[in-house]
Design a protein with these regions (language model features):
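Extracellular/luminal low-complexity Ser/Thr/Pro-rich, glycosylation-prone repeat/linker regions
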Residues: 1-10, 106-137
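A surface/secretory-pathway sequence property marking extracellular, secreted
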Residues: 38-83, 120, 125-127, 132
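Low-complexity, intrinsically disordered segments enriched in Ser/Thr together with acidic residues
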Residues: 77-107, 112-117
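Hydrophobic core residues within well-ordered beta-strands of beta-rich domains
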Residues: 4, 23-25, 87, 103-104
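Short beta-strand elements of extracellular/lumenal beta-sandwich folds
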Residues: 10-12, 16-38
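Short solvent-exposed strand-capping/beta-turn motif centered on an Asx-Ser/Thr pair
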Residues: 30-36, 45-49, 96-98
């Protein structure tokens, strides 16, 4: 069984006339084991059509990296997660262009070391939005 689980949810979708202008994303990390973990690394990946806004909800990221292809990695370091503890990371992303049609947000990952020191990587779900085109009269 997984000791640490991560789920990705969309809390809010802000629409403009041309499609989606912003999305509020929530990452839910839970320690289901009977012991604490230290030095967790959470990475969320954003496609090149979107970028994180400057406002971060609960926990500010340690770093935001842009790859040469334009995709973005948002990274949070969590020093310690106690047994049974849950962390909620929320942040807003804005789109550079209005998004219409199918839009997929890749899954996030949590990396941590187990008691034996082995690196464990857990992936969250991916999210797909279907944005209908607005009918214009």
């Amino acid at each position: 069984s997984r000791k640490i689980v991560i789920t990705k949810k969309i809390m809010e979708v802000r629409k403009s006339q041309d499609g989606i202008s912003g999305i509020k994303v929530l990452l839910h990390i839970k320690n289901k084991s009977s012991f604490a973990f230290t030095k967790l690394n959470i990475t969320d990946y954003l496609p090149k059509l979107v970028a994180p806004s400057k406002e971060f909800g609960t926990i500010r990221p340690t770093t935001v990296q842009r790859s040469p292809s334009g995709a973005i990695r948002v990274i949070w370091d969590i020093p310690r997660l106690e047994r049974g503890e849950e962390r909620i990371i929320s942040y807003n992303i804005r789109s550079r262009l209005s998004i219409i049609g199918r839009f997929t947000l890749p899954g996030a990952t949590v990396e941590y070391r187990n008691k034996k020191g082995r690196l464990i990587r857990v992936h969250s779900n991916r999210l797909t939005l279907l944005i209908p085109e607005e009918k214009r009269e």
